């Protein structure tokens, strides 16, 4: 099955659920397949449980809503990505100002590598966040990271000015466009 979201194409094998899994794990696997195929907004709890030969009652024994299920699938992964990005920003900001220009690429490079490595280790969950989360709080991951980066950029501009190396002022719209493009 080929699933197309935005400009990304993902290949998803037909969903076959291991019957040896617990009911909860079966729900998670079926939900991942449904969300990857249809996105959060168009995914159906009925389809998820029907694909397992279960009832909605079985589902509601574990979760109160589709939103709660999606949170269970991606919440920890979303939090890891945001926390890792914030940690890199803090590591950089905590350096002596004189060192910052010399190591900026090092810290951000390690952060991006770590985040990409994590995303590949948790590929389906990260695809859910980045491509299938419209209608959830997770759909704002890139926007949240852009805002963190904008704040970091402004702090770094102040450091450069303090070091006698001021950077030219940035138009806020252009700054937002450039930083957003960096994440896409």
Regions from the PLM with identified roles:
Residues 1-20:
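N-terminal intrinsically disordered/low-complexity leader segments
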Residues 30-37, 80-91, 125, 181:
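Solvent-exposed, amphipathic alpha-helical segments
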Residues 106, 110-124, 135-164, 173-180:
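Amphipathic alpha-helical packing segments from all-alpha helical-bundle domains
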Residues 95-102, 129-135, 165-167:
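Short linear capping/connector segments at secondary-structure termini
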Residues 71-80:
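Alpha-helical DNA-contacting segments of helix-turn-helix folds
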Residues 72, 86-118:
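Hydrophobic alpha-helical connector segments
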Residues 26, 30, 34-68, 72:
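Helix-turn-helix
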């Amino acid at each position: 099955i080929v699933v197309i979201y935005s400009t990304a194409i993902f290949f998803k094998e037909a969903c076959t659920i291991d019957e040896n899994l617990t009911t909860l794990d079966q729900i998670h696997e079926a939900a991942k397949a449904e969300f990857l195929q249809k996105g959060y907004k168009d995914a159906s709890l009925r389809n998820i449980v029907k694909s397992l030969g279960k009832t909605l009652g079985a589902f509601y024994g574990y979760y109160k809503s589709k939103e709660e299920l999606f949170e269970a699938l991606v919440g920890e992964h979303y939090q890891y990505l945001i926390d890792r990005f914030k940690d890199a920003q803090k590591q950089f900001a905590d350096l002596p100002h004189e060192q910052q220009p010399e190591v900026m690429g090092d810290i951000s490079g390690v952060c991006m590598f770590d985040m990409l490595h994590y995303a590949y280790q948790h590929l389906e969950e990260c695809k859910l966040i980045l491509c299938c989360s419209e209608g959830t709080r997770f759909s704002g991951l890139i926007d949240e990271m852009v805002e963190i980066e904008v704040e970091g950029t402004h702090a770094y501009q102040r450091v450069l000015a303090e070091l006698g190396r001021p950077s030219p002022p940035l138009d806020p719209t252009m700054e937002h466009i450039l930083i957003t493009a960096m994440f896409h």
